[in-house]
Structures are given as structure tokens and as C-alpha cells.
Amino acid sequence: MDVVAKLDEKKMTTPDEGGWSPRDNLAHLTEWMNSMMGYHMDKRPPHEVMRISEEATRGWDMEVINPELFERNKDRSTQDVLDELKRTYETVLAKLESTPFEDLMKPRHAHDPEKRPLLMWVIGDTSGHFEEHRQVIERML
């Protein structure tokens, strides 16, 4: 959040060349944290968790999913996005603290030949994803 603290309201809502503002990036991260908890940790159907069509989640096509998430969030206020981001992050932390480490190390998908652990998906939708979008936001400074 250090990089976000450097942004005033104008910078928070100014889109980059791809059309996303820092606020849009933060709303996107919140969507994916919620998705990670609902789909990966709670094992609910992805389309229900993400509130998008089942067809969109079937192939995990980010060129379909991410624009839908963007459209849903683009008109939200900066404060609303920041408040939800904070609440969601706190929920992620609480959920991880209450999950036994052994469960995080179990394969997420029974059909995965690589037997990748749940923890890999958690990292991908949290710290790995945060880093990616932090870099995007920093380029806008």
C-alpha cells in the first residue's frame, strides 16, 4: 500500500495506456483475492464465486474474465475500492491463519498431474499478483 499512499485522487483515477487506473488495479486485486478464497480455498464453483458466466470460467480466459471484472468495478469510488480491498485482505489473512499448514500443502486439484498445493494458488492470487500490479501502478507515478 506504500505505492498507493503516493497517489492523490486524480492519479488514482487516471487510466494508463491500457485503460486501467490504479483504482481499477486495486479493485481487480480484490476480485481475485475473493475468487481465491471462494474457489480455491472453499472449493465453490468459480462462476458463482466470480459472479460471471460459467462459460467464461471454463477456459480461464483472462481476456474474457478480466474485462468483466473491470466493467463491474469501473464506476466505484476510490474510497469504496480501498475499503473493500482492506476488508478483503484482512479476511484473507484470517482465513489463512485458521487454515492448517498441512491443508495448504495438499494438492488443490485432484486431477492435477503436478499435484500443485493450494498454497501455490494462494500465493499466485495474493503476493504474486500484488507484485505484478504494484509494478503497473508504479509506472503510472
Question: Which positions does each model-derived feature cover?
Answer:
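Generic anion/oxyanion-binding catalytic loop in active/binding sites
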Residues: T14-P15, F70, V81, V122
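Acidic/histidine-rich alpha-helical segments that form the ligand environment
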Residues: R58-L104
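Short hydrophobic/aromatic segments of transmembrane alpha-helices and their interfaces
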Residues: D8, K86, K115-R116
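Structural signal for well-ordered, non-membrane alpha-helices
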Residues: M1-A5, M33-M41, K86-P100, E131-R134, ...
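Short, contiguous alpha-helical
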Residues: P15-V64, L104-L141
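Long, hydrophobic N-terminal alpha-helical segment
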Residues: M1-S21
